[in-house]
Amino acid sequence: MKTKEIVDDMTMKRAITRITYEIIERNKNLDNIVLAGIKTRGVFIAKRIQERLKQLEGIDVPLGELDTKPFRDDMKVEDDTTNMTANVNDRDVILVDDVLYTGRTIRAAIDNIVSLGRPARVSLAVLVDRGHRELPIRADYVGKNIPTSRSEEIIVHMAEIDGQDAVLLVEGA
């Protein structure tokens, strides 16, 4: 299998900063936002967006962690490790994930969010959109569009868990 780094740490930082600016531009009331990071790497991306929002706008946006496994249609897991202390009722919830592929993880995340309350709006921010949707889901905020074939895989490395920031393309996975 051939592996190629397609996003380095500086490019990832810029992509997350761009997503943050787009969130600021498209949301009139930043006080109504709740970030919901999808475990595992989506949580780290959401924390970085949260930090940038604080730096740029001086606002402390609530952040929760979503576990999508209990809501997936392709696996049966009982343990739900969701940690969402913020009230999502009538709030603008922004789901945050590392890679958007088939859309099945996002569908599970939406199911999880609506099990917690009734948000005013749910939008989606992803670091990488690689295409190949199986469900009618699209990201509102995208760091990088990286078209792939189905035989390729996108792997996101985050410094918090992997020791470095990078996005890798693995051919023939």
From Swiss-Prot:
The keyword rRNA-binding does not apply. It comes from Streptococcus suis (strain 05ZYH33). Gene3D superfamilies: 3.40.50.2020. Its EC number is 2.4.2.9. This is Bifunctional protein PyrR. One of its GO terms (molecular function) is RNA binding. GO terms for biological process: DNA-templated transcription termination. Signal peptide: none annotated. It catalyses: UMP + diphosphate = 5-phospho-alpha-D-ribose 1-diphosphate + uracil. Regulates transcriptional attenuation of the pyrimidine nucleotide (pyr) operon by binding in a uridine-dependent manner to specific sites on pyr mRNA. This disrupts an antiterminator hairpin in the RNA and favors formation of a downstream transcription terminator, leading to a reduced expression of downstream genes. Also displays a weak uracil phosphoribosyltransferase activity which is not physiologically significant. Pfam families: Pribosyltran. Homodimer and homohexamer; in equilibrium. It is an enzyme of class 2 (transferase). Belongs to the purine/pyrimidine phosphoribosyltransferase family. PyrR subfamily. Keywords: Glycosyltransferase, RNA-binding, Transcription, Transcription regulation, Transcription termination, Transferase. PANTHER family: BIFUNCTIONAL PROTEIN PYRR. A motif (PRPP-binding) lies at residues 93-105.
